[in-house]
C-alpha cells in the first residue's frame, strides 16, 4: 500500500522537510550539496547548480535525509519535466530501515546540457508499506550517508 501525504508527514522522517515537495502520494526530493559529473566532484551548494552534459551521467546527492521505519520501503522515479528534457534515472529500492541522504544516478540522453539548480525538485519518492516488517532491516554499506557516496565495488 502506498502512503498518502498525511501519513508521509506523520510517519516518515524527512529533513529538511518542504511542504512544496509533499505530493498526494509521494515526496519530491531536491538536489543537494554535492554531485559528481565528468569525473569531477562538484560543490552544488557553492556553485548554485550542476550541469549534466549530453550523453553523460551524474551522481547527485539529495538535499533531504530520509529515515524509513522498518515496515516501509521507498521507490523513486524521475520527475516528468526532467524526463521530457531527456534525463533518465536509475534508482535502487530504498530499503526498510534506511537512514541517510541518497546518492542518485541521472543520465542525460539528450543532445543538450541539462542544468539542475541547488534545491530543485528532481526525483519523486513514494513510500510502500510492507505486509510485515522484515527480519533484517537495512544496515548495509551506505547506511547513514550524509555525503555523496561512490560504489563500494570499485575505487574511482
UniProtKB/Swiss-Prot annotation:
What are the entry keywords?
A: Hydrolase, Nucleotide metabolism, Nucleotide-binding
Q: Which Gene3D superfamilies match?
A: 2.70.40.10
Please give one Gene Ontology molecular function term for this protein: nucleotide binding
The pathway this protein participates in, as annotated, is: Pyrimidine metabolism; dUMP biosynthesis; dUMP from dCTP (dUTP route): step 1/2
Key word Hydrolase present in the record? Answer: yes
EC number from the UniProt entry:
3.5.4.13
Oligomeric form and interacting partners:
Homotrimer.
Record InterPro entries? dCTP_deaminase, dUTPase-like_sf, dUTPase_trimeric
Q: What PANTHER family does the database record attribute to this sequence? A: DCTP DEAMINASE
Q: Which residues bind dCTP?
A: 79-84, 95, 124, 138
Name used for this protein in its record: dCTP deaminase
Q: Which organism is it from?
A: Pyrococcus horikoshii (strain ATCC 700860 / DSM 12428 / JCM 9974 / NBRC 100139 / OT-3)
Q: Which reaction does it catalyse?
A: dCTP + H2O + H(+) = dUTP + NH4(+)
Question: What GO terms describe the biological role, i.e. biological process, of this protein?
Answer: dUMP biosynthetic process; dUTP biosynthetic process
Q: What does this protein do?
A: Catalyzes the deamination of dCTP to dUTP.
Pfam families tied to this protein: DCD
**What's this protein's family per the entry?**
Belongs to the dCTP deaminase family.
Q: Where is the signal peptide?
A: none
